[in-house]
């Protein structure tokens, strides 16, 4: 029987990431053979990971890494926010972003086959992390963005890494690119332009906006306030030339009815048309970057501001931890509480 020394345990821990007791047990079971102990720990880790496979991991972090003209943003999930602050977990997220930016995989399957700094595949690294951390740790998604030498990356993380953004701009500089990414983090656009919005999506969102107006009108009626009108349009995509021309004619008719002299109409109509466009592009403002009011200059939209500095956004990616994941009611915290309650009930 080989002597299991503290030095041997330390060496195994450094190579495997296992805890002290797990490392010592593995060495005892393999008679001090480091390589066999690593394999044993890996097998046990896979078994532990398999037991946790059905758990919902909706917490975690994003990772952002820029490698020359290639940038990656990733989302890695854990079951609890507590683990998301664990140094091992943070290192795993950062290493994942780095190997993806350098490896440029086409999809998750290719990403999981990439080699991590430890020599493991990315997939094996997550199995090991699940075993050593004690929660389900999962690699969820990534986005890769490339730029030219003349373009600029804006890399930004917010709220302790729960939100990660990369943007690419043409013109401007790195500082402007970062400001655009900060805006994206705060305002949550999903696409660049109204041209990317699905027609049915716009109709559904417009219906929801009008439903909110109906609810507001019920409250207004209770206090004697006049009802607000429904929105006819929600996106610039719906504002055809005919619609815009009719809006201008309606404004002229309104000015005539008010007795405004025609010689001043040219000074009034542009402002009213701007208001018409603003009131009838609410869906664009919620979901498209260029239509949003720029948080660094609320007198302009993002599009107008960029035009004023001869810059444009080429592409962006925004990840927020847990978006789109339906967290089970019996999550990890509840599972722990239930286990403790059961244990107390047995005593």
From Swiss-Prot:
Pfam family, one: EF_TS
SUPFAM superfamilies tied to this protein: Elongation factor Ts (EF-Ts), dimerisation domain, UBA-like
Transmembrane segments: none
Positions of region (Involved in Mg(2+) ion dislocation from EF-Tu): 80-83
A GO MF label: translation elongation factor activity
PROSITE patterns (alphabetical): EF_TS_1 (PS01126), EF_TS_2 (PS01127)
Principal cellular location given in the protein's record: cytoplasm
The entry's keywords: Cytoplasm, Elongation factor, Protein biosynthesis
Gene Ontology cellular component terms for the protein in this record: cytoplasm
Subcellular location: Cytoplasm
NCBIfam families for this protein: tsf
Family affiliation: Belongs to the EF-Ts family.
Protein task: Associates with the EF-Tu.GDP complex and induces the exchange of GDP to GTP. It remains bound to the aminoacyl-tRNA.EF-Tu.GTP complex up to the GTP hydrolysis stage on the ribosome.
Database matches in PANTHER family: ELONGATION FACTOR TS, ELONGATION FACTOR TS, MITOCHONDRIAL
Name recorded for this polypeptide: Elongation factor Ts
Name of the gene encoding the protein in the UniProt record: tsf
